[in-house]
Structure formats: C-alpha cells, structure tokens
Amino acid sequence: MKSHSLSIVAVLLTLTSALPQILPICIVGAGPAGLTAAKKLEDKGRKVVIFERQVTVGGKCQAVYADNTFHPLGALLFSNASYPETLKVIATSGSGGVTQAPAITSTFSTLVGHEFQRYAQYWTTIFAPYSALRYKDGVPQELTVTTSQWLARNNFQALPVLFVQAMVAFGYGDRREVPILYMLQYLTPDILGFFAFFHGVELIDFHKVWVDWTKKSITGPIYLGSTITKIDRLGPLPVIIYKKSDQYGHEPILPQTQVCSSVILAFPPTIPALQAAKVVLTPAETTVFSPLRLIPYFSGAVRLQVPRNLGFSAASPPNIPVAATGAPVSLLTLFNTSNIATTWSWGNNSTTTPVALQLLKDTLSKINKDPRDPAVVGKPVIDKDILGFQQNDYFPHFGPQELAGGWYEKFNKLQGAKNTYYASGLNGFETVEFAIRAGIEIVEAFF
C-alpha cells in the first residue's frame, strides 16, 4: 500500500513538472512585442496562444488604405543602421520601404555639426554601456534628469530644436518632463542624424509588414477580437477567462477559459490597463506600476485640400514644445498620388478621444486650402473627410524620481512572479525596434 501511494505521488510530481511544456504560454497583445515573443517561443518548441482585442494584428501599427496606398496610423519610419531586428521582420514579410530624404538646410546643419559630434561621443562612451533592455545594468544619476536639464548641463544650444522635433510629433512628450535616459535610447546618433538633415530614413507600411510576417512566422492560435474578462493568478497556474468574437463580431454569451503555463503581458502595464484585465495586483506590482506614465497621443488620416507632399506643424518657438491640448501638432501628406494627410496630436491626461477629434476638425478646417493663395478660405473638415483616427496609450515610461529610486530594479524583480512577464515599450523604448527586442529578450532571459 505504501509503495502504491509513493507511485501515485511520483506520477503527480511528474505531471506537475511537465505542465509548463504541455500548457501554452499565453501572450496578451498581438503587437510587435507579443508577436516576436511568440515566434521566439515557438522556435524553442513551446506552445503559444495569443489574445488581441483588436480584429487584426500589429498593435499600434495600423493603417488606412485609400487612393491605392497606405496611410499609417502608427509607426511609419525605420533606419537600416538603428533597426536591425526590424529589418529581419521586414525581410521575412517580403515588404519594401521607400527612402524619405529630408531637405538639407546647410545653415542649420553647420550649426548642429559640432554639437552632433559631442553628442555621438557621449552616446557611445557614457550611455551605451547602460542601454541594455530593462536597464539591467542600472541607471546612473546623470541619466535620470529631464532631457532639458541634461541638454543644458552639457551646453547644447542647437540640439534642443532637434529634440523638440523628434519628441512632440512622434508622441514622446515634453523634453522638460521626460528623462534623458529614454531620449538617448531613442536618438541614436544615426536617428538624430535624420532630424539634423544629414540623411534620410525608410518609410514602410508596418501594418502590412506584421500581417504578412505573422502568416509566415506563427503557427499557434491568435484570438483576434477577444475580450479578456479576467486573468486569474491565484492558483499555481495562470488562467485567462475571455470572450472571442466570431467572424461577424458577435461575442459568445458564455466566456471561455484558457489555462496557461505562464503569461506574457505585451502591453504597457499601467494600473488601469491591468485592472481592466481584472488582474489582482500584488503590493509590489502596485508600487512599481502606479507611477508609470503615458503620453496621450492620437493619429489620423484625413482627406484635405492642400498641395501634395506638404507638411504643417503647430507654431511654437523651435526649442519649446507646443502645449499638450489634444490639438494636432503635425500633419504630412506622404504621397503625391493622394490628398490624404497623416496627422499627429498630443494631449494631457484629461484629453478624451472625442475632444481630440473635434480639435482635429476645428484646426484642420482653418488650413484646409492652398496656402500659396492668401485669398482662399479654408474648407471645413467634416466627418467623412476623416478616414481614420486612433487613440494610442503611448510611450510607457518612468519619471526622474522613479529612475533615481531604482524603479527598473524593482520592475525586473517582478518578471516571473506569479508566472507573469512584461514585454512592452517600457522595457526599452516605444518604437517598433525596441518592442521587437523586448519580446525577444523576455523569451531569451526567462524561457
């Protein structure tokens, strides 16, 4: 009898230890981080299940298709020198980019030139050793200050103009608030060189890239249009309770259940986002994620009566960001075959999507004309002119106080707790390249 009992215990222990290999790893979010984590896991022979609330993959990489071309609502640019992992994804997808070369302003380039060299030297010798994902090597005090403070301390006079251009229109906030750590991660000497008009970058349809790449790269199920009603981590294994829409967008009456060996949360882990998934947070998770900041960032595709290949930016002193009211800060008609402009707006924590949309229409109505003819009155922009408008929970980051308080060390200690892992722009920076790296690194480090 004793021998029989021991045999049962042995079998149970064997089954328990085998569960992580039998059960799938559940990934919440089918953006660049979640998709590349899934690919890396499948390469290791692990099963995956992906949950995505949108009806298509790509995360923030969405687009509107009209006039026989794409109009990006998310990421649109990449650089061969600074985006090595992105290049691999693009190659697999079979898509190609179009070079966007800026108009070179020789006077400004000369002004920036000597400061650029100092910046590149600092980036290589001081910042690069601390640039690892999840900032595992620590964050020196000098990298926790705001971007404005860092620029002033290093006596940069021309670079603030480039930083404003690189930050505001692309959703990265106010240099007077955002720590320099993140801007150095973003603005490699190569990327800063683009904003200094030294060279061009590549423009590509990232939504198509991810759709095509996913078809070729991932074999596990992807539950698009799914609503997670609870992520239960109270037991030994995480359980995701969800409702998955059918092909007509109808959700089932009864929720479905997926038991997971682990969960990778591939979205910005803000407290509201975690609470929306009904995650019961631990005290440590509440401490780490409560001060997490986002930039309220909106993107649109609007049909306008402006000349082709024309851009507008909100007026402000060149080294001072425009106010974050929710109004558009920049627009650009990317193709001379279309009169659809891509727009970018940024707001504050009280800016709602309806408010930002109304500000978009009001602002663009004033400039919806040919600016070369001062007698022409702007044509009102109405709902049918707006082909797409997207609100983005953008650029998750910690503030100077948290960075100085060792918040990334606290964040890294959460990885794996309750079989939960985090992969998003918070791990490095909010770009396609760093999202890809975040997904890969989490798998390489913990699986």
What function would you assign to each model-found segment?
Residues 435-447:
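Internal hydrophobic alpha-helix adjacent to the cofactor/substrate pocket in enzyme cavities
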Residues 1-20:
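Fungal secretory targeting signals
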Residues 187-262:
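Helical element adjacent to the flavin cofactor pocket in flavoenzyme catalytic cores
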Residues 63-86:
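N-terminal glycine-rich dinucleotide-binding loop that anchors FAD/FMN and/or NAD(P) in oxidoreductases
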Residues 261-262, 271-421, 429-433, 437:
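C-terminal segments that line or cap access tunnels to active or ligand-binding sites in enzymes
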Residues 22-50:
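N-terminal Rossmann-like FAD-binding beta1-loop-alpha1 element of flavoenzymes
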Residues 87-178:
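Mobile amphipathic helical/loop "lid" adjacent to a hydrophobic cofactor/ligand pocket
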Residues 42-65:
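Glycine-rich FAD pyrophosphate-binding loop
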